[in-house]
Amino acid sequence: MQSERQKYIRNFSIVAHIDHGKSTLADRLIEATGTLTEREMDTQVLDNMDLEKERGITIKSQAVRLIYKRDTGEEYTLNLIDTPGHVDFNYEVSRSLAACEGAILVVDATQGIQAQTLANCYLALDNDLEIVPVINKIDLPSARPEEVKQEIEDVIGIEAEDAPLVSAKTGLNIKDALEAIVSKVPAPYGDEKAPLKALIFDSYYDSYKGVVCHIRVKEGTIREGTEIKLMNTGKVYEVVEVGVFVPNYMPVDELKAGDVGYVTASIKNVRDARVGDTITEAKRSANEALSGYRPAVPMVFSGIYPVDGAKYEELKEALEKLQVNDAALSFEPETSIALGFGFRCGFLGLLHMDIIQERLEREFNLDIITTAPSVIYKITKTDGTLIELTNPTNMPSPSEIKLMEEPIVKSSIITPSDYVGAVMDLAQNRRGIFKDMQYLDTTRVSLNYEIPLNEIIYDFFDALKSRTRGYASFDYELIGYKDADLVKLDILLNADVVDALSMIVPRERAYAKGRNMAQKLKEIIPRQMFEIPIQAAVGAKIIARETIKAMRKDVLAKCYGGDISRKRKLLEKQKEGKKRMRQVGSVEVPQEAFMAVLKTEE
């Protein structure tokens, strides 16, 4: 059932590979529809975190309402939902897409289709969205729009003959893109009188309003004073304000089926308004929630410790504040012998981890040490119990382990054909299993591998970029677990295990990794007054050793000539002292040592 009002609404999002000009296109659409005045326009209006502007990436989903007047005089309401393009934030993208009826697929006219173009495009197709291809950056001399159109038709299989050719930077042909949205994206359906059903596609904490939920109303009507219930948590709230974004808040009386807007209901914590949850009326609730909700599952874990132990409480507060805004971040307290008190934090992926670390340092002025990231291993013990291991320190002894499984990802790498050899070599070094390859055109190949997640969480992306001169693109998704022969590699300094440096590695690589780490630590740890043995061990077996020599004073300087026994006495005395020192001395491990562990030998 479609009302007259709904015929003039279009809900769409923009999907693209990183840096193909998604946020810039959003800026031009905002400008072309006169949503903001010239003075208010700022580059990348929708990326409002400093970090987003600096890295030039979109992290949180955003929404904005545009009013577009056609030449025929009809007025359309376009709700644009800007989504992140990075693979870590896939769940953010999928929920934003569920709030739309159509998606603009932005493809760079100079680069063509990249790995994430495909991944995001398939996500959009999974949500049954109408896909409108738009070819961007046609102002560049190296643009090849006709070839890219052909590529879109061949690789993705959607009609691209009349795709608008635009330049988001200069604002060329933006009107064509707006026309394409109005004519190709379907209008929303939904009964305005049915019980309320609204999808939360983003939520964040505002210090004045409490949690602000970005919602797409699928059925029914929501207005101020409505008693609402969140279907997955079952909590009931009263609506304080509903409104729309013009990117800033603009309160309205009500939101009806088909609308996109925000709602506040003095909710205190983002965890209570999970993204993907369904809002309904408390008194007249819908029978079932909207499908597709799944809580965000962290894939990568890392320990975060304050450099100064006294700042533990501050770190805890900072993490709690970030968590209010980021439902995907999880943390729990843990202690390390080497680093004291800290937290084991779970992240969606490496970029997410990087951003959280940077925000802790920037917004909260904290000095932190982070340990090597690790993934979740599943261990079946001999007595049949199953444990999920996120911290290598807690690994049970080998005699108790019956089976150990590690997460495997399906990855697709798109690379120029000249570099296929180098990429295959890299994937094999990382224990990748080759699945298939296909030529996208004469110069580019898509390779599909199954790779253990553990192998890509450190520096796979950097290694891939450096081997292909920055041309390859990469995308991955978790497909499941597979059993593996893994051991725990411990590092001992002065015969003490440094728990924060422990890591889980495949058995056949333990020796090489141990050697490598011992050598790296020897370069990084400063010399002390006594000699320090650095040992790498698997279980009770030492597999590699390096020694940091002691700094010593020349005790023979004052002996000129004279008897050898006198010199020997002084040397023996010095040796005794160093030995005593070694028994009581402790070794300070600098932050660089923890980082060095991550960089594997390429």
Curated annotation (Swiss-Prot):
Report the top EC class in one word: hydrolase
One short Pfam family name for this protein? GTP_EFTU
Cellular component terms (Gene Ontology):
plasma membrane
Q: How is the protein disposed in the membrane?
A: Peripheral membrane protein
Q: Where in the cell is it found?
A: Cell membrane
Q: Which family does it belong to?
A: Belongs to the TRAFAC class translation factor GTPase superfamily. Classic translation factor GTPase family. LepA subfamily.
The name under which this protein is listed is: Elongation factor 4
> What gene does the UniProt entry assign to this protein?
lepA
